[in-house]
A protein has these predicted regions:
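Alpha/beta enzyme core
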Residues: 14-19, 26-84, 88-209, 213-219
Length: 219
């Protein structure tokens, strides 16, 4: 069956349900034992809440260690039946054995490389590895994080939800079915509920929000 992961995510979205994505940052795993330990901890934590965790993301905006990415994906595939979705920060984040990939365009980057050029370089790899591509508009919110720095982004101010909504509408009109609002790992502030609501009001696809979330209450 084609588009298995997207179909799975659509089922989560149906009825206005909210899902939590586990993100494994491969940069932190220099050895196989580190990955296996983390995999055990993650899977034990979510074994009773599988419906809340539809997929596992591997990567991150600053993840550049291709060998680490490959190691993490292979070990996670052995440990869980949950789909593994790549979240690459560059073409080095495209590795085999995953089920799908967030095929992102950093729409508010000032560097065309992150908008279309990296995608052109990575597309043949995605095809060769038979990864399910999830067309995603990646939007950096705020400034001062690794995602903002490495992506050379013109960060959308947290108090300007209509700007984010305009990008989301543009993404939808260009055929993208996913939007990711990213405050960035370690961000001092999370994406505001007002911005999420504003984007949701104009975007019909799958909306993801990350960065700066340190508690269940904030989430």
């Amino acid at each position: 069956m084609r588009n298995k992961v997207e179909t799975r995510l659509k089922k989560c979205k149906k009825g206005g349900k909210t899902a939590i994505f586990l993100l494994v940052d491969s940069e932190n795993f220099s050895t196989t034992s580190n990955v296996e330990k983390t995999a055990r901890e993650l899977l034990n934590a979510c074994k009773n809440m599988k419906k809340l965790f539809p997929v596992i993301l591997v990567g991150g905006s600053s993840a550049t260690d291709q060998m680490g990415m490959d190691r993490a994906v292979r070990i996670l595939r052995k440990k869980t039946k949950l789909p593994i979705v790549l979240f690459p920060g560059n073409i080095t984040g495209v590795v085999p054995k995953a089920h799908a990939i967030l095929f992102t365009s950093l729409m508010n980057s000032e560097n065309p490389y992150y908008i279309t050029q990296a995608q052109a370089l990575g597309a043949p790899l995605v095809r060769k590895m038979k990864l399910e591509a999830l067309p995603t508009a990646y939007l950096i919110i705020g400034e001062g994080t690794s995602a903002w720095f490495f992506g050379n982004a013109r960060g959308i101010p947290f108090d300007k939800p209509k700007i984010a909504a305009s990008y989301a509408m543009a993404a939808q009109y260009m055929g993208m079915r996913f939007v990711y609002l990213e405050a960035g790992s370690g961000a001092k502030q999370n994406v505001t509920p007002e911005m999420v609501q504003t984007v949701r009001s104009v975007f019909d696809g799958f909306l993801m929000v990350g960065g700066g979330i340190r508690s269940a209450k904030t989430a």
